[in-house]
Amino acid sequence: MKKRIRELTDLLNQYRQEYYTNDAPSVSDSEYDKLYRELVELEQTYPAYILKDSPTQLVGGTILTGFQKYQHQYPLFSLQDAFSREELNAFDQRIKSAFPEAEYLAELKIDGLSISLVYEAGILKVGATRGDGTIGENITENIKNIKDIPKRLSQALDVTIRGEAYMSRKAFKTINEERQENGEPEFANPRNAAAGTLRQLDTRIVAKRQLATFLYQEVGLEAADSQQRTLERLADLGFSVNSHYLLSSSMNDIWDFIQSIEATREELPYEIDGVVVKVNQLAIQEELGFTVKAPRWAIAYKFPAEEKEAEIVSVDWTVGRTGVVTPTANLTPVQLAGTTVSRATLHNVDYIAEKDIRIGDTVVVYKAGDIIPAVLRVVEAKRSNQTPMPIPTACPSCQSQLVHFEDEVALRCINPLCPSLIQRSLEHFASRQAMNIAGLGPAVVEKLYSAGLVHDVTDIYRLSLEDLLMLDGIKEKSAEKLLAAIEQSKANSAEKLLFGLGIRHIGAKASRLILETYGDLETLLSVTAEELAQIDGLGLVIGQSLVQYFQQDQATQLLAELKSAGVNLAYLGQRPDRQAELFGLTVVLTGKLEKLNRTQAKEKLEQLGAKVTGSVSKKTDLVVAGSEAGSKLAKAQQLGIRIEDEDWLLNL
């Protein structure tokens, strides 16, 4: 067996050389995989004979079985979008009114996939996708096959690095030519190709497809004093950093840079879809903070989207989970931004009236934010005798009278028994960010509703195997899996349930903030809007919406029924202890700690109720300083901020 292991190792390494370096494989993938699996089985049986150069011990030789979920220690926020000079000016005015000394760093917005790289003692431990910003997927083995990502840093740092993985235009062209030759469907664009590559289970394919990265953020280290310095430090650590950026305090300069980049973007070897403008000084970033969704110190200017002409054939009106009735145009198919588009949103009735959009019109279609197809304008020169579009007065689902509130642009169905509203609400409740009930998608929801088995979310927890087997197309194995997923959802932390209820203005992050503060859903029956508005990151509108919902008798009954069904109503995450010694204090870590690493120190401070930030400002209450503390310690002393050492922290 030892001889066979040596033979297989040599043979597979030869094939790896042909595949990766020479790009001229002499055997098929299936033949390689067959030999590889034989080697794996032998090594599992005779582990003492595993050779150091075995391809099973090398990055690039792994056949993965799937991807595990990964919870980010630090959330990855999205960015506020801007589509005009006016929106950039408004951003500038908001920043400069509070911080006249603010500078901006404008960076290219790479059209790729957000990734997070976690290093412990300088070793790459985790590579993950962004996901929903809180939970992504662990794609570490694939990340290790991206050549420009360091597997080991020159310093033994505990740090999280963020950036974009992308596919160059050249690599994209090559892969599509290969797929065409092999009779495989071509990728629509480099971003799709990069996304498909990162989700490959065969890491050899990832290695061959030549993904690359640009990194732009570090989290968990003693912060640099600016975003520009962060980029320089990342480059020093061996990461790929995009050199196309501009530092200026003038939004006029930033706008000129954006215009210049837009005019020459096709000359770049990779695709971009805009420019990100960030406040350069990290101390100002710290003071500006975040909304529930995005940092207040950054904005993403998106280049105007590609536009195409198409004819509106018909219009569908659909009811969403909040009762909003949305018009969608059915179009003659057009190729747009690498995909075939045959439907586009018309937004709402006010938009239709403003643009005077009619069935039969030739319209200009674009992808809003390069994602959602939308109708931009009518091509008046091609209009003949089209008549104004009839606007529905009755709900397309339940036929009840639609309303158009003065302060809203949309038509709304207010019938709580509307079939579409109920079904969309149930789909939302079961969605991944909410209760995450796998198998309870639109098709199954429609069957359950049509059979009279579900009318609200509590009915989900009354379903039996017999109920599900009554439905057309539902087999016993699928039914058992769905019931298991429903049972598993009962144990979710309560913020997922709160989000799943679909209360207006209450998103996933707001749900978490609310439950972190109040602990369980039943407590929300007695809170006031003013109390809720005091939570950092929320506001009075969210508070009023939540209170209005929980003042209804139906809400009390709903919680009682869910509780009776065994659904957890409590927040299971770590809550700030209001009695904790450091509750409510803003704390900065600086210098080298001897007994704790940076992550452990941060976790201990947070357990004691502190908010740990990266830079010293007037809002800082306390600085914990280790040895070799530098500018942060000096600034804290200058501002008269309380300073403690590591031993003090250990003794708490």
UniProtKB/Swiss-Prot annotation:
Could you tell me which InterPro entries the record lists for this protein? BRCT_dom, BRCT_dom_sf, DisA/LigA_HHH, DNA_ligase, DNA_ligase_AS, DNA_ligase_CS, DNAligase_adenylation, DNAligase_N
Does the record bear Aminoacyl-tRNA synthetase in its keywords?
no
Q: Which residues form the active site?
A: K109
| Residue positions binding NAD(+) | D29, S30, E31, Y32, D33, S78, L79, E107, R130, E164, K278, K302
Enumerate the GO terms in the molecular function aspect.
DNA binding; DNA ligase (NAD+) activity; metal ion binding
Instruction: Tell me which residues bind Zn(2+).
Output: C395, C398, C413, C418
Query: Which EC numbers characterise this protein's activity in its record?
Result: 6.5.1.2
Which GO biological process entries does UniProt record here? DNA repair; DNA replication
Which SMART domains does this one have?
BRCT, HhH1, LIGANc
Cofactor(s) needed for function: Mg(2+); Mn(2+)
Query: Briefly, what is this protein's role?
Result: DNA ligase that catalyzes the formation of phosphodiester linkages between 5'-phosphoryl and 3'-hydroxyl groups in double-stranded DNA using NAD as a coenzyme and as the energy source for the reaction. It is essential for DNA replication and repair of damaged DNA.
The record's comment on protein family reads: Belongs to the NAD-dependent DNA ligase family. LigA subfamily.
Q: Can you name this protein?
A: DNA ligase
The scientific name of the source species is Streptococcus equi subsp. zooepidemicus (strain MGCS10565)
